Amino acid sequence: METYQNNHPAGKRELVFFLLCVFCGLFLTNVTLFGGFHLGFAIGVILSVVCAAGYLMKNGRKKSPYALTILALCLVIAGSFARSDDAFVKFVMVCFLLVAIPLGLAILAGKNRRDPKAAASLADAGFVFFGLSFGELPASTKGLTKAFRESGTLGRKGGAVLLGLGFSVPVLLILIPLLMGADAAFEGLLDKLPAFDLAEFLGTVVFGTCLSFLLYTRGAALRFYEDAPRAPKDRKGLPALTLNTLLVSVVFVYCVYLVSQLAYFTGGFAGLLPEDYTLAEYARRGFFEMAALCAVNLGIMIFSLSLCRDTAPKSTRFLCLFIGLVTVFLVATASAKMLLYIGSYGLTRLRVLTQVIMVFLAVVTVLVSVWLFVPRLPYMKAVVLVALAMGAVVSWVDVDTFVARYNTHAYLSGKMEQIDMAHMGSLGDGAIPYIDQLAKEAEDPMVRQMAEDLVTHHGYHKAEDWRSWNYVNHKAQKYAPEEIIRDGVAVEISPDSRGRSLYLVVGMEGVTEIEVSTPTTSGGCIHADGSPLKKGEKLWLEQADSLAGVSIIARDKYGEILWMMDFPKNEDSEHYVIDDWIVVIE
């Protein structure tokens, strides 16, 4: 019997929840689009999850500890965005949040369609994200509109005002530019107002409004949506004999491989090198291949168990158990070999992340292996919680900081005879404090010099405002030279014998010409012989004595634009920071 509701009833509680969703949607959109995945994003995600969970918890249902734990770990992961500056890890964590938050909310509301103990339960996240958030948008909007009409005079007037504000935005966007072009006095009045970013306003309103309705629809649908009962489907799959044939062939190959490589495996555990191999060759070879093998083995186990036509017989389970034990053994062996390599050559991002993945695969393999003979084990719940917990740890630790700290301490303590400064330089802001430590404490003068150069020429990015702030980046700023010029030209105004004059300081290699245009004049700076301008070279320009309305373009010898900047007509601040350029007025 179809029990699907054509609309979701809404009362005062839904109206309050909708207003909270509007705030969260606009806030999260603004801080993400114009601040990145940093402090603002962390606050926005935490607020949206807390609002949704609070709305769904007051429904008289027994609270699921599993769902609450998922959401709590999501909050911990979201908080890490205010600490870490690792773009790759943040991307992975965003993917985690996109799956875990809908899954946790669905289980909390009791609207999960699949058993949380099964691997298929992850599909509920997709159902909530697409099926409810988008599919139930008309129903939730209809219920919300009806609630506004029935909420009394204040509710009707409030809805009318919101609708009027929505219509006024595009109208004003047309009127204001036309009035500015028609009247100089009106344009001058607006120029004196605080800076207003039209693109930011439009982006926030348009995308924030869309996100607000999606957040509300997700919450309302999780509370009111009733899924039509589905008839149980006959289990289809492959005969056990077919799967056992596949598993036996895999087991046979592993048996032969283990026998042929036994000396190498035991050597890895004992710390003894096979003859004719150096430490680097022995420890490095095969580590990443073993990581891939672990993933393939786990896939074979899940494939065989999920495609078995009937309940997997003991023969299939024992074959899967053998593959699981081999997987754990491969993880232990690869880890032992990698520890040998790390002891002499230190850590890298790739080694750390690969090791984390292998440990996770080993944990999943153990859980699946136990589940083979203990079917009531909620292995999928454990897998989800372990994945989120490991993700939270990796995010908060910050891989660049962890790698740099280990390598620096191991090198300075004598545990490592050499340190890869090229890799240290490739790390992010988290490595700067430890590179600075090398510059001060390393005995090798070459290492000290390389460390000093890395600290001096590191690509420092100062947060434009609180939205783009994160702890690792903030900490690295303390080690930046007082006057750091990166990838461009610093613009300064200093008094001299002729009064205030504008001069440029070339801050990058390859600049051949710098064009400067003011509201009244234009000119350029080039060498007579066409040779590139030297980094640090000062070029005096007498046609400007302020930044107001100044346009600067730096070109290479081919005429390609390396950097350009147009300063506002009312720019008179004493410290102007834009992207990678630092502009100072003295």
Model-derived features with residue positions:
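N-terminal signal-anchor module of multipass membrane proteins
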Residues: 1-54
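Juxtamembrane membrane-water interface segments of multi-pass membrane proteins
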Residues: 2-16, 57-66, 112-117, 139-159, ...
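Membrane-helix interface and helix-disruption motif detector
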Residues: 27-42, 59-63, 82-94, 188-198, ...
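Transmembrane-helix bundle segments that line or gate the permeation/cavity pathway
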Residues: 30-34, 43-184, 208, 212-224
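Short aromatic-rich membrane-water interface segments that cap or initiate transmembrane helices
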Residues: 192-207, 275-295, 347-358
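Internal/C-terminal transmembrane anchor helices
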Residues: 251, 377-400
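Hydrophobic alpha-helical transmembrane segments in integral membrane proteins
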Residues: 392-417
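Extracytosolic and intramembrane catalytic regions of membrane-associated proteins
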Residues: 425-586
